[in-house]
């Protein structure tokens, strides 16, 4: 009888869904960057690929066809990340479920055409590596020549794992 119970318990445990905590986030060798060096997703997990998010208009008094309407890199990144957060929430996910992020930054005219990595990082740190949401995704950040609108400085894609 005991043997049957143990066998049943083992089979039940083996068929139980994998918990979100089963995702392994490997620390980056350089602890100065708030990202994971790598993220392992166990077999059987559902990956959710979220299309690129661009910023909403943040300054309604600026001309709609201007960079000023969308703000600087930090403002644009914050808006895009809020959009991603809302989209994930609609799917029953959170920013803590994000395992991979790709960030496309256009050179900021106010910064001599160079990407504002520091401004992006300030926005990013509001959503990742906080006391409330400590999970860090693996991330790639790159400067690109342009995005779909000449007024966008930021576009962000994420991949999340369904817990």
Where are these regions (language model features)?
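N-terminal presequence-like segments and the immediate start of the first folded domain
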Residues: 2-82, 86-102, 108-163
């Amino acid at each position: 009888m005991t043997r049957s119970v143990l066998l049943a318990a083992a089979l039940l445990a083996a068929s139980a869904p994998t918990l979100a905590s089963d995702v392994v986030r490997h620390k980056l060798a350089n602890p100065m960057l708030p990202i994971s060096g790598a993220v392992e997703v166990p077999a059987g997990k559902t990956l959710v690929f979220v299309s690129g998010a661009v910023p909403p208009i943040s300054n309604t008094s600026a001309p709609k066809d201007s960079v000023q309407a969308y703000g600087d890199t930090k403002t644009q990144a914050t808006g895009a990340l809020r959009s991603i957060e809302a989209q994930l929430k609609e799917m029953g996910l959170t920013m803590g479920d994000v395992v991979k992020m790709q960030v496309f930054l256009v050179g900021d005219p106010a910064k001599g055409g160079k990407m504002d990595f520091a401004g992006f990082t300030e926005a990013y740190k509001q959503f990742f590596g906080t006391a409330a949401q400590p999970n860090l995704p693996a991330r790639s950040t790159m400067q690109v020549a342009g995005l779909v609108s000449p007024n966008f400085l930021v576009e962000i894609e994420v991949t999340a794992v369904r817990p």
